[in-house]
């Protein structure tokens, strides 16, 4: 799916790649859509678990966001194909259903973390989509540069602790209320 996208996925192609009969796939999945949804839910839950490892919604905003960045970066750098797959899902008709069925504590913990940070005066109040875009898009772009092995200028790029710390510090500064 990562290589050919959803349109390029057929049960026959998948069966051939797995060296099994297409009928075998239908024992486990009702349809192509069911296969995509089940794999997507599994992958989403793995990413949620990786992000939440050692995370507590009671952490300070600074500590909690840094922790999430490091967990997410570690997961995506270890699993670049999964990251690409999840990006495909995020912009597909399957995403809403995946989130609904994943039914994870992830969203609740993220919402609690943001609410706590706002209550403590550590984070400006923003619509969740604006917060999420500012808080995590820079990390995802850095990970993509790393996976591609090149930065925006075409020169070699490798994501390291220093780059993560620089970027997350700027993000935190931008999301804190003026004092």
Name these PLM-found stretches:
Residues 3-7, 58, 79, 120:
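Short coil/turn segments at alpha/beta junctions that flank glycine-rich nucleotide-binding fingerprints
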Residues 11, 33, 37, 62, ...:
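Short, structured helix-loop boundary elements
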Residues 45-52, 78, 94-120, 129-134, ...:
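Amphipathic alpha-helical packing segments from all-alpha helical-bundle domains
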């Amino acid at each position: 799916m990562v290589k050919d996208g959803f349109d390029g996925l057929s049960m026959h192609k998948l069966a051939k790649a797995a060296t099994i009969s297409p009928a075998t796939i239908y024992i486990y999945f009702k349809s192509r859509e069911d296969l995509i949804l089940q794999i997507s839910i599994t992958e989403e839950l793995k990413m949620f678990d990786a992000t939440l490892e050692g995370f507590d919604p009671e952490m300070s905003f600074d500590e909690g966001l840094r922790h999430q960045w490091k967990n997410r970066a570690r997961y995506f750098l270890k699993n670049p194909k999964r990251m690409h797959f999840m990006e495909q899902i995020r912009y597909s008709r399957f995403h809403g259903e995946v989130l609904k069925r994943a039914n994870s504590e992830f969203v609740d913990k993220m919402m609690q973390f943001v609410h706590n940070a706002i209550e403590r005066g550590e984070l400006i109040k923003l619509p969740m989509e604006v917060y999420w875009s500012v808080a995590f898009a820079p990390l995802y772009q850095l990970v993509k540069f790393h996976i591609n092995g090149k930065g925006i200028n075409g020169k070699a790029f490798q994501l390291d602790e220093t780059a993560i710390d620089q970027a997350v510090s700027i993000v935190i500064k931008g999301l804190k209320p003026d004092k």
